[in-house]
């Protein structure tokens, strides 16, 4: 591999940002009225792992506590960008919950200066239930504690896979040097 090829490989390497710094993790949020599932990527941006479920308490005090929890996640995991699940109807139209997800995304942009991606999350909760059923996870309270995390993982993994596929297509289109 020549010097030119190595330099080109760095441009499409998911471990590099255009600024030349190391890519930091991507965090995903599955935003609901009562809970927010949180997942984070590995440092290279290949895989998604569940972090926790943030329980929403409402009111100004509850909202401040939510944002403090988000800030801790961003600092602890050196997050560079975020993905927020965008719950669209199967037709592609906006659901009522989509406006709430978009407002949350805007707040992340404004408060933390993050690059935030709204990502189609259709059927992720259904798929999350299937994963939990296949793993023999209990129903009721235990399931509610983790279902949003699993949905956030599915949203994030979909985003990471799409990003990797785009990088591969771009590299293939550039052709050999």
Which stretches of residues belong to each language-model region?
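Phosphate- and other anionic-substrate recognition elements at nucleic-acid/protein interfaces
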Residues: 2-28, 34-177
């Amino acid at each position: 591999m020549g010097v030119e090829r190595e330099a080109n490989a760095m441009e499409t390497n998911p471990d590099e940002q255009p600024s030349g710094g190391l890519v930091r993790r991507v965090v995903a949020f599955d935003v609901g009225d009562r809970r927010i599932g949180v997942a984070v990527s590995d440092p290279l941006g290949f895989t998604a792992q569940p972090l926790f479920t943030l329980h929403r308490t409402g009111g100004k005090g509850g909202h401040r506590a939510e944002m403090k929890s988000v800030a801790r996640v961003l600092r602890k995991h050196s997050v560079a960008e975020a993905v927020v699940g965008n719950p669209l109807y199967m037709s592609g139209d906006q659901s009522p919950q989509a406006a709430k997800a978009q407002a949350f995304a805007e707040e992340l942009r404004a408060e933390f200066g993050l690059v935030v991606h709204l990502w189609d999350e259709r059927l992720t909760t259904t798929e999350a239930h299937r994963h939990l059923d296949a793993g023999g996870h209990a129903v009721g309270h235990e399931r509610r504690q983790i279902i949003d995390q699993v949905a956030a993982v599915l949203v994030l993994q979909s985003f990471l896979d799409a990003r990797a596929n785009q990088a591969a297509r771009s590299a293939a289109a550039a052709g050999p040097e």
